[in-house]
Structures are given as structure tokens and as C-alpha cells.
Amino acid sequence: MRLVIAQCTVDYVGRLTAHLPSARRLLLFKADGSVSVHADDRAYKPLNWMSPPCWVTEQDTETGVALWVVENKTGEQLRITVEDIEHDSHHELGVDPGLVKDGVEAHLQALLAEHVELLGAGYTLVRREYPTPIGPVDLLCRDELGRSVAVEIKRRGEIDGVEQLTRYLELLNRDSLLAPVAGVFAAQQIKPQARTLATDRGIRCVTLDYDQMRGMDSDEYRLF
């Protein structure tokens, strides 16, 4: 991973155009090929980013200022004009073991993948653990109309789970082969604050009855 703190301007050129005026920012160049631009706020969210695969070229402008061009396979570009570099370092992090789900969450995922129709009539499973540059989506499905649906599964549904699914949706909806991608937040229990946030973001909530999904008697299975 390469970490750069620099005074820079950033322009996105592609399906849309976006401009970030000159400011000190953190630039992340990851080993997977992704590049992201961060400010000292917005928590985990980058100001702009480019998903892998993408390629970086460094050029000199007529004014002598460095121009870093990040381009993906579709020709979209992040054009980073670097005015001054405060820090530039490389770090080898190695292979991350990834997030290990607890036993109940892992079993919920397996059961829901097997009985994906519990999410709605006509739902089909595309893949478990669908890979993205920021981690795997628990389930990627298609609804009765063939539209993509990303499903995040938790034992207890809290705000951080909704935020996690939001990050996946932001990334997946940039893929023209998948977009538009809807979201489903599925858990045994969903806290009111998490449900409110999910609803506000257009994410559907599903309450799962673990006992029923294992084949035990229960009258508590509900879809919301």
C-alpha cells in the first residue's frame, strides 16, 4: 500500500464530472489496484475513488506540477494534480485473513442462501460471499424481475451493519453490469435506529427466525 499526503486538486472525468479544489488530502494506492482520495472527515468514506483494475501514470504539466492520472478499463479517470507532497511511503501489509463471522451468522448465511426465496417470491442466488474491493457481500441475488440485490446478514442488526451494506451498494452500483443494485439488511434482531437508517437509505429490512430456518417450530418469522 502506498500512502501519500499531498496538497492536490482532483478531477473525475467519466460518465459525470466532479472537481475537488486544492486541499491537503490522503491518497491511498492499494495493492489490489484501487485508488482513493480522503479528507480528515467523512469517517471511512473517500471523497472519490477508482475501483480496480486501474492504472496510474505520472506526468509533468507545463507549469512543472505533477499530474497523476488514474484510469480504469472503461476509460474513466481520476486526474490528481499534485502541488506539494508532505508524506509518501510504501507498506507491505500481506494477505488479510478477513472478517470471521460468528457461528450463528455463518449458519444464517448458509441457510438463507439455500432458501433465498425467504427474501421474496422469485428470488434467486447469484453467489455467496460476492467479492468486492472492500470485502465480500454476504449474498448477491436477483429478484423476481432479474434486478441485482445485495444482502448483508447479521445476528444483531445495528447501525454499523447498515453502514457496511451502504458501502457495498455504493461500490456495486458503479458496476454497469450489476446496476441498479438494491439492498436487503437481514438479521435476527434489528435495532430501531438501524431500521430507521436503512429505510431512509432505501434498504429493505428482513427479520430472520433462526429456529424456523433450521426447521424448528416457530410462528415469529416476519418480513418487513
Curated annotation (Swiss-Prot):
The GO terms this record gives for MF are: DNA binding; single-stranded DNA endodeoxyribonuclease activity
Q: Where in the cell is it found?
A: Cytoplasm
Q: Which keywords does the record carry? A: Cytoplasm, DNA-binding, Endonuclease, Hydrolase, Nuclease
- Principal subcellular localisation of the protein: cytoplasm
* Matches recorded under Gene3D superfamilies: 2.70.180.20, 3.40.1350.10
Q: What Enzyme Commission number does this protein have?
A: 3.1.-.-
Where does the secretion signal sit in this chain? none
Q: Does the keyword Cell division apply?
A: no
Q: Which GO terms describe its cellular component?
A: cytoplasm
Q: Which domain of life is it from?
A: Bacteria
Q: What class of enzyme is it?
A: hydrolase
Note whether Nuclease occurs among the keywords. Answer: yes
List the NCBIfam families hit by this protein, alphabetically.
Answer: PRK03298.1
What is its biological role? Cleaves both 3' and 5' ssDNA extremities of branched DNA structures.
Family of the protein in this entry: Belongs to the NucS endonuclease family.
PANTHER family linked: ENDONUCLEASE NUCS (PTHR38814:SF1)
What is this protein's name? Endonuclease NucS
